[in-house]
């Protein structure tokens, strides 16, 4: 193996390990390792084939980080592993493709100063992640900043820079560190410059962490002074995917969520008691409580949460046209609390085509309060990529057909008792 080929292989291995270990995975999650990925791509820009090397540097890691798509295809789409694994591999190749573009662009500016090169790297990374978020159907998974989500102090700059802007900031810091380290080990003449570059990168990351620590320290006080405390009851039904969409399980799923909601409200009554004044009295909940409480206890303290939250597609039927929609509305009326929940939404296009949306609904005791359609959908789970819209993959969509991406819509207001 030639020196050039060995170097490309080493960069590919380093980049892929950085992507996999730097993002949540079932093995080992080392958030800061993700910063080695843009550094590996910067080094790839100095090879004879920057695009190919940069692309290869991300494929295994991105495919491994998206392992859950293959698992879903195998477990719920009933694909043999021979067909399920390529779902993750193809998406990994697509994500890594943008890394190849980054290396190719950085190869064009290899002769500028390291400071300018790092600044360019940050801007290019920002633009590439932003473009990947909307290009085609948009695929915004595995962003650089998302790798740090496990450390709250390090993600607070998102409040100022946004996800893609912070990714660009991190990429610039990683490239500065790479420039510095290559000089530190490159000979005595360049060590001073390398120390300054690496120190600047460390200063950038320290500033981000310091801002995060400061923000986490002051925000509780600011929220207490300026905001309104809101209490939630969150319910996760954990309904098995292989039965979730079966028509015969729809009522069972609805009643399961109703029971869990009542259990959650009861469990929190003690903590919330006395915190609110205007609340439905226990007598108002008696009809529903008498139906679903196994022990027949229809008493609840006046203190209840402000909002009930159920997850994405919690209800396995089209709302509001589904046969159980009336019972769901009755539940919310009797609880006297607003409910945010997910369910499929069905619309008709002007051409008469049926359009399916992954929709979040707000339902209040007074009636429907608005909805939001999910914009970034999961390939092979919520839709089939255009180039792979084959009949063989239809089982992955759980018999629903593909969801349509939503358009940007104004947020709806949740009515609070206070």
PLM ranges: what are they?
Residues 214-418:
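Soluble catalytic domains of enzymes that build or remodel membrane lipids, polysaccharides, and related
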Residues 1-2, 286:
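Short, intrinsically disordered terminal tails adjacent to the first/last structured region
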């Amino acid at each position: 193996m030639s020196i050039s080929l060995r170097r490309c292989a080493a960069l590919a291995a380093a980049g892929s390990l950085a992507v996999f270990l730097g993002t949540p995975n079932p093995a080992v999650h080392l958030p800061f390792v993700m910063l080695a990925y843009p550094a590996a791509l910067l080094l790839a820009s100095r090879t004879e084939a920057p695009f190919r090397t940069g692309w290869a540097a991300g494929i295994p890691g991105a495919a491994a980080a998206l392992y859950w798509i293959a698992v879903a295809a195998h477990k719920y789409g009933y694909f043999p592993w021979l067909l399920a694994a390529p779902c993750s591999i193809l998406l990994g190749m697509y994500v890594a493709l943008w890394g190849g573009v980054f290396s190719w662009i950085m190869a064009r500016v290899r002769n500028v100063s390291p400071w300018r090169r790092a600044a360019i790297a940050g801007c290019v990374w920002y633009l590439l992640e932003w473009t990947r978020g909307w290009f085609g159907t948009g695929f915004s998974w595995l962003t650089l900043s998302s790798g740090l989500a496990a450390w709250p102090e390090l993600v607070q700059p998102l409040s100022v820079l946004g996800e893609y802007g912070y990714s660009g900031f991190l990429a610039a810091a990683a490239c500065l560190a790479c420039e510095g380290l290559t000089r530190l080990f490159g000979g005595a003449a360049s060590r001073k410059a390398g120390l300054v570059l690496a120190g600047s990168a460390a200063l950038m990351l320290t500033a981000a962490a310091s801002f995060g620590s400061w923000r986490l320290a002051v925000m509780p006080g600011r929220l207490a002074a300026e905001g309104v405390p809101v209490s939630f009851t969150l319910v996760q039904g954990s309904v098995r995917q292989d039965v979730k969409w079966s028509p015969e399980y729809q009522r069972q799923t609805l009643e399961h969520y109703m029971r869990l909601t009542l259990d959650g409200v009861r469990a929190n009554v003690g903590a919330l008691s006395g915190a609110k004044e205007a609340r439905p009295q226990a007598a108002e909940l008696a009809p529903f409580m008498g139906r679903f409480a196994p022990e027949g206890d229809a008493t609840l303290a006046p203190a209840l949460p402000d909002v009930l939250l159920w997850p994405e597609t919690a209800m396995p039927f089209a709302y509001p046209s589904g046969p159980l929609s009336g019972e769901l509305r009755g539940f919310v009326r009797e609880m006297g609390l607003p409910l945010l929940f997910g369910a499929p939404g069905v619309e008709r296009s002007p051409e008469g085509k049926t359009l399916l949306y992954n929709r979040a609904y707000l339902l209040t005791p007074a009636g429907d309060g608005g909805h939001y359609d999910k914009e970034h959908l999961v390939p092979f789970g919520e839709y089939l990529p255009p180039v792979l819209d084959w009949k063989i993959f239809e089982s992955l969509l759980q018999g629903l057909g593909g969801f349509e991406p939503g358009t940007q819509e104004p947020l709806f207001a949740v009515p609070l008792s206070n």
